[in-house]
Design a protein with these regions (language model features):
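Membrane-embedded alpha-helical bundles that constitute the cytochrome b-like, heme-associated redox core
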Residues: 1-156
Length: 156
C-alpha cells in the first residue's frame, strides 16, 4: 500500500517540480517565509514592531492566523516525504540534526496551539513558543532546503 502512496505522491510532486526533493525544498521555503510573517505579526500582536508593521490590529490577527494555517499546510507534504519515504536517517551530522529537529516540529506546534486556546498562562509563554517554533522550522529548512539549493540545485 505504501508503494502506491509513494508513487502517487511522486507523480503529484513531479507534475509541478523537477523532483520530489525539489518540491519538498520549495514547500519548506514557503513555510519559512510564512514563518517570518508569523514572527512579525506575532510581535505586532504583542505590541512590538508597531512602527514597522503598520497594519490595524484586527487585520494583523487575521494575517497571523491565516499565514500560520498556510505555513502548516506547506509542511504537510514535507513531513509526509520525510516520515514515510525517507524515514529516520543518520548518515551525516546535518541529516541527523534534521531528523532530530523534525521530531520536534509538530510537538512544538501542538503545545503552541494548546497555549493559544488556553488563556491561563504567563504572557511570555506564547512569544517563547512562537519563537521556538520558528527556530525549529528555520533549523529544519537550513539543514534541508537551504542545503539543497546551495549544494544540489536551485530551481523548480
Amino acid at each position: 500500500m505504501l508503494a502506491n502512496v509513494n508513487s502517487t505522491y511522486t507523480d503529484v510532486m513531479t507534475s509541478v517540480f523537477s523532483s520530489t526533493i525539489a518540491g519538498k525544498a520549495w514547500f519548506a521555503t514557503a513555510a519559512v517565509a510564512l514563518g517570518v510573517v508569523q514572527v512579525s505579526t506575532g510581535a505586532r500582536i504583542f505590541g512590538k514592531l508597531e512602527r514597522i508593521v503598520r497594519i490595524p490590529r484586527p487585520h494583523v490577527n487575521s494575517i497571523h492566523r491565516w499565514s500560520g494555517r498556510v505555513a502548516f499546510l506547506c509542511t504537510l507534504p514535507v513531513a509526509f516525504h520525510c516520515i514515510f519515504i525517507l524515514g529516520f536517517q543518520d548518515v551525516s551530522p546535518r541529516v541527523l540534526a534534521h531528523t532530530i529537529m523534525g521530531s520536534f516540529v509538530y510537538g512544538v506546534f501542538a503545545v503552541k496551539m494548546l497555549f493559544v486556546h488556553d488563556r491561563d498562562h504567563p504572557r511570555w509563554a506564547l512569544p517563547v513558543l512562537g519563537g521556538t517554533m520558528f527556530a525549529v522550522l528555520v533549523t529544519l529548512w537550513a539543514t534541508s532546503a537551504l542545503w539543497y539549493f546551495t549544494n544540489v540545485r536551485f530551481g523548480l
